[in-house]
């Protein structure tokens, strides 16, 4: 695999500024920083984005998340460590990240409605869309995570 291809911030600063503005908005919502980072980590696991996995695992640790919850996120459906609200968010994240296969199933949406209001569902859906966009930018432009 080739090294880094394009620096998106240099090539399209206005586009990147807009994406960062959406991220700023998302961090002002009622979703909460921890859930936001867990959702970003989960989508990044599905997409196989090493750059984003590195970044979001560090953010989770900085925010006080336990190593066990970070490690087991890939098997969230088998672990009792996550709340019903988190599990509903992860199921929605999985469904939207794999949307060509799932088409956002009604049962997943119905469970989501039990834990999130309309605005939160739109915010969560925006969050999932954004991390999928970031994953695609990082993977396609070959962003590399730091190596200690």
Regions found by a protein language model. Name each.
Residues 1-148:
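Hydrophobic alpha-helical segments
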